[in-house]
């Protein structure tokens, strides 16, 4: 019978072999609108460089909008989030993700340095994503703000999410998939979980979401308490009180 020590040594030896077989990833570092951006070197090869450069232009434009739309205090917090550009992963759809959990990252081949950062493994479809979700970078940054600044268990947000689910007011709403594509009616992505409720409504607050409520005005009519909470946590000035009519 093999001893536990022998098994441990065997496991460590296997890990060393696996590590040697998988070359370490290397990245180039750039700064866009005050954010640190780490670009996987494989995206900068001649075959990929043009697509990557176009994605970087679009990313810079989205970050510039974030700076324009969001108050300086929250922007300073958002700029602490490192952005990572990666090639697509085998057996995964190209996507952008905020990495909050080490366990998920280890299981899906991400490097530890990406923890609490945002990874864009969707460079090839970046332009299409900006058409579908005009503020999709803000969506991911909202996840980071929720985790790093507000805390995942923010009590006010949790209560409003539970109330929205119970009300069923998001069960069948309009969805826009981009220019020249028909509007559909679906359950709102915001109801997936509280994190998506915050990110989706933050898109509506600052610009246009791809699900109803699309805009700040629609959010104020559909979910006024959530609008009020968002204005508070994003440090927006209080809206002016209505002026009394003059005689």
Annotated model-derived regions:
Residues 18-24:
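Boundary at the C-terminal end of the N-terminal hydrophobic targeting segment
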Residues 56-162, 166:
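Acidic/His-rich structured neighborhood in mature extracellular/periplasmic domains
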